[in-house]
Amino acid sequence: MKVAGFDWDAGNWPKCAKHGVSKSEIEHALLHDPLIAPDPAHSGHEDRYIVIGRNPQGRAMFIGVTFRVVDGRPLIRPIPARYMHAKEVKRYETQRSQTENR
């Protein structure tokens, strides 16, 4: 899906900011070769996805998102976002290399 931008508001931005991440880091991680997987455990009235990406400095990030159409424009709505812990990064890198070697 090609997206037209991001859906930021007072509902989702504070959830991301409380973990010390910036909007620009989140947007970069989502636009530069992220790994995206469905998140059925957190999907209710709308589908949610888990996204693993990297900020401009290469730090791994975990981001929960949903996709919405607002005024006819498809947007990415980040919900929670945080930096990944070292153990999570190691697991992600192992899985990613196994996927790429298939």
Predicted regions and their residues:
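Ribonuclease/tRNase effector modules and their secretory precursors
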Residues: M1-R102
